[in-house]
């Protein structure tokens, strides 16, 4: 798990995301093209399809703070997802674990705190990109609603956790404020 994200460190998280944005966008596009031979349109179904060959274990675990992990047994990496959590959290966890399975070369070989924390930030940002894609246009087209209702609609439409939606919208707003292209414009 990466650092705990709160209002006080949100700008730092967005800054870290800016450092890894291009790399993560490239990885997201590679997944959508190279690992989606069956042209699955649902991001959630694609995640499950990618995890199955790794021996995905889905089981309810009575711990609201434990969403998933990768266990290594006899050299084989096996993803586990906590099904006791809401589906949105499960999908986010699935993409998070896919990042570790396919791209993370640090977390399984040795532990260096700063590298591991950055790999966790990359995994979370990657999961957010895979689930939320182009969130801002959807959000802005939800007219005549209060902020919280719009967030709930985004959570439902993208099957994404509350915190991921808030961070993505904040990041998009920061990008718009500084007139850089939105980090969420991937197809």
What are these regions (language model features)?
Residues 1-180, 184-187:
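Active-site hotspot residues in diverse enzymes, especially metal/ion-binding acidic/histidine motifs
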């Amino acid at each position: 798990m990466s650092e705990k994200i709160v209002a006080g460190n949100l700008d730092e998280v967005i800054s870290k995301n800016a450092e890894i944005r291009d790399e993560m966008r490239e990885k997201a596009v590679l997944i959508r093209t190279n690992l989606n031979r069956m042209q699955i349109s649902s991001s959630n179904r694609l995640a499950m399809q990618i995890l199955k060959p790794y021996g995905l274990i889905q089981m309810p675990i009575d711990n609201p703070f434990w969403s998933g992990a990768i266990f290594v047994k006899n050299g084989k990496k096996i993803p586990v997802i906590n099904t006791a959590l809401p589906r949105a959290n499960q999908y986010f966890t699935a993409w998070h674990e896919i990042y570790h399975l396919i791209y993370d070369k640090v977390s399984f070989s040795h532990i260096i705190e700063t590298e591991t924390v950055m790999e966790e930030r990359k995994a979370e940002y990657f999961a957010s990109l895979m689930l939320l894609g182009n969130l801002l246009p959807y959000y802005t087209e939800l007219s005549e609603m209060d902020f919280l209702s719009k967030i709930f609609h985004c959570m439902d439409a993208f099957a994404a956790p509350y915190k991921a939606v808030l961070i993505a919208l904040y990041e998009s707003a920061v990008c718009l404020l500084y007139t850089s292209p939105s980090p969420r414009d991937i197809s």
